Curated annotation (Swiss-Prot):
A single GO cellular-component term on record: proton-transporting ATP synthase complex
Known EC number: 7.1.2.2
Catalytic activity from the UniProt record: ATP + H2O + 4 H(+)(in) = ADP + phosphate + 5 H(+)(out)
Known partners and oligomeric status: F-type ATPases have 2 components, F(1) - the catalytic core - and F(0) - the membrane proton channel. F(1) has five subunits: alpha(3), beta(3), gamma(1), delta(1), epsilon(1). F(0) has four main subunits: a(1), b(1), b'(1) and c(10-14). The alpha and beta chains form an alternating ring which encloses part of the gamma chain. F(1) is attached to F(0) by a central stalk formed by the gamma and epsilon chains, while a peripheral stalk is formed by the delta, b and b' chains.
Topology of the protein relative to the lipid bilayer: Peripheral membrane protein
Further remarks about this protein from its record: In plastids the F-type ATPase is also known as CF(1)CF(0).
InterPro entries per record: ATP_synth_asu-like_sf, ATP_synth_asu_C, ATP_synth_asu_C_sf, ATP_synth_F1_a_nt-bd_dom, ATP_synth_F1_asu, ATPase_a/bsu_AS, ATPase_F1/V1/A1_a/bsu_N, ATPase_F1/V1/A1_a/bsu_N_sf
Entries under HAMAP family matching the protein: ATP_synth_alpha_bact
GTP-binding keyword on record: no
The protein's name: ATP synthase subunit alpha, chloroplastic
Site (Required for activity): 363
Keywords, sorted A to Z: ATP synthesis, ATP-binding, CF(1), Chloroplast, Hydrogen ion transport, Ion transport, Membrane, Nucleotide-binding, Plastid, Thylakoid, Translocase, Transport
Family: Belongs to the ATPase alpha/beta chains family.
Length: 508
């Protein structure tokens, strides 16, 4: 290699100097003067924006929430154990974003969409802001497609449509999560992407849900977002928005999605904790003044998009826990007013053996009836009224000794209709199975059986229909209408199986 002369070297250096353009990079730095309980107070950061991501010396991220006269209050997205007084903080100029994409299906992630299932990193190119704006009025269309839950009580009387927000509300241990998980199981083979968000739950409860979904092959189309009870309040507050963001990716690619928030009471409590530590003024039940906005901006992201945007949808099933059935508390009333209806679960019904323990009287679906399949409307039209009258009569009959025959008949019919609504956990039914059961009940065919025999008979009838009259199922699946031909087949099957069932009962 030839040695360069001093002249050549000086010319080379001159060229490099001429090509150099000085760059001045301004970084807004601040100093931590107080840290603890997941909150940091910082001097400086005069150009920080509300909701901006901040980076601490040890790599921990935070979000600027309080912009005060001489300091910034930030919440930490981690334990922050290495942050001390005097630590430096810098603005990033970004807001909280998470990666999104197909690769998340079947994965378990934390409140910032980081995998926690030990299956390695999630390979994806796209990302979305955690706090994305909800679709506007022009971007939406009215709810018109059904989202079948597989539960007779819900699909017949409180139907849910794709793009709807339907609240599941009740005391602890009344089966709220069971309804949500059954709905996920029932989406198998229907192309619906499900996101289950566990907020402030025990790790064992989330593991139980995960195992149920795995066993039933439902994890392939489901994402689980978890912010357990032992995680910082910030992650419990962000987890629902992360779940909505993951679902939005699929919604904007034209697919139906289902998001379950289990439960929003815990998110509100985490937000209350953060707000009180940030010294924000407390309001009713010590919640901050913007706790309504906390839930409204989350649930407004659920929508049915119009044709131009690909007709995707996000259906939200938020869960709220009540204390002693008190639906007039602050968070329950807020979420009831935001959602398009509620499924109310009563502890008394649950303990009396009616499961799912849905109180039909005060449960309602404000937009779902437009999405209910025609076949279901045909057989379940008067069901809610009949059950309400039965509940009234049942209460009255406890005090009356001699009842006329018509009242006795109505009580007998009501008891059998109530049996139709009972359903074991993790066994959702298809529309054709539900229609056959309801037709048998509302037309008096079950009156010939003892109340204790009804569930066994209906279970056998469903198998008998599938094996002996497959055409009935084909008609309902293709037309979603209870045609005269389908009705004839069901009548025939009911009568035939009734004789068979009675002879089996006698033999036993």
């Amino acid at each position: 290699m030839a040695m360069r002369t001093p002249e050549e070297l000086s010319n080379l250096i001159k060229d490099l100097i001429e090509q150099y353009t000085p760059e001045v990079k301004m970084v807004d730095f601040g100093i931590v003067f107080q840290v603890g309980d997941g909150i940091a107070r910082i001097y400086g950061l005069e150009k920080a924006m509300s909701g901006e991501l901040l980076e601490f010396e040890d790599g921990t991220l935070g979000i600027a929430l309080n912009l005060e006269a001489n300091n910034v209050g930030a919440v930490l997205l981690g334990d922050g154990l290495k942050i001390t007084e005097g630590s430096r903080v810098r603005c990033t100029g970004k807001i909280a974003e998470i990666p999104v994409g197909e690769a998340y299906l079947g994965r378990v992630v934390d409140g910032l969409a980081r995998p926690v299932d030990g299956k390695g990193a999630v390979q994806t190119k796209d990302s979305r802001a955690i706090e994305s704006p909800a679709p506007g009025i022009v971007a939406r269309r009215s709810v018109y497609e059904p989202l079948a839950t597989g539960l007779v009580a819900v699909d017949a009387m409180i139907p849910v449509g794709r793009g709807q927000r339907e609240l599941i509300i009740g005391d602890r241990q009344t089966g709220k999560t069971a309804i949500a998980v059954d709905t996920i199981l029932n989406q198998k083979g229907k192309g619906v992407i499900c996101v289950y968000v566990a907020i402030g739950q025990k790790a064992s409860s989330v593991a139980q849900v995960l195992n149920t979904l795995k066993e039933r092959g439902a994890l392939d189309y489901t994402i689980i977002v978890m912010a357990n009870a032992n995680e910082p309040a910030t992650l419990q507050y962000l987890a629902p928005y992360t779940g909505a963001t993951l679902a939005e990716y699929f919604m904007y690619t034209g697919r139906p999605t289902l998001t379950i928030y289990d439960d929003l009471s815990k998110q509100a409590q985490a937000y209350r904790e953060m707000s009180l530590l940030l010294r924000r003024p407390p309001g009713r039940e010590a919640y901050p003044g913007d706790v309504f906005y906390l839930h409204s901006r989350l649930l407004e992201r659920a929508a049915k998009l119009n044709n131009a945007l690909g007709e995707g949808s996000m259906t939200a099933l938020p869960i709220v826990e009540t204390q002693e059935g008190d639906v007039s508390a602050y968070i329950p009333t807020n979420v009831i007013s935001i959602t398009d209806g509620q499924i109310f679960l009563a502890a008394g019904l649950f303990n009396s053996g009616l499961r799912p323990a849905i109180n039909v009287g005060i449960s309602v679906s404000r937009v779902g009836s437009a999405a209910q399949p025609k076949a279901m409307k045909q057989v379940a039209g008067k069901l809610k009224l009949e059950l309400a009258q039965f509940a009234e009569l049942e209460a009255f009959s406890q005090f009356a000794s001699d009842l006329d025959q018509a009242t006795q008949n109505q009580l007998a019919r009501g008891a059998r209709l109530r049996e139709i609504l009972k359903q074991p956990q993790s066994s959702p039914l298809s529309v054709e199975e539900q229609v056959a059961s309801l037709y048998a009940g509302t037309n008096g065919y079950l009156d010939k059986l003892e109340v204790s025999q009804v569930r066994a008979y209906l279970s056998g009838l469903r198998s008998y229909l599938a094996n002996s009259y497959p055409k009935y199922g084909e008609i309902l699946r293709s037309t979603l209408t209870f045609t005269p031909e389908a009705e004839g087949l069901v009548k025939q099957a009911i009568n035939e199986y009734l004789e068979e069932f009675k002879s089996q009962a006698k033999a036993a």
